[in-house]
Amino acid sequence: MSKIMAIVSFKLPQKQTLDQATAMFQATSPKYLNMPGLLRKNYFLTEDGMRAGGVYLWESRQAAERVYTTEWKAFVKSKYGNDPEIVFVDTPLLVDNERGRISSL
């Protein structure tokens, strides 16, 4: 069974620089460390600085849905000013150039 990737994004109330976004993300990142079912999270900021979010790799959709609760969505809206958008995608294969391998997830 392949892992599930969740692409979460939200519109920001005002333009953010990369330094501002990094500081903003550092404030929430500790809560994701050692989170059950979460394998990896990459934060992102769009080039125009108006949209941000995260790309999460989960063991399963169920693990992701245990986190993306009504309360979590309300937290995101209160912190960033807009509702998060969540897109789930299957990730059957990984090309890892750092390790020089291709593997099934």
Which residues make up each language-model segment?
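A common structural junction motif
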Residues: 73-79
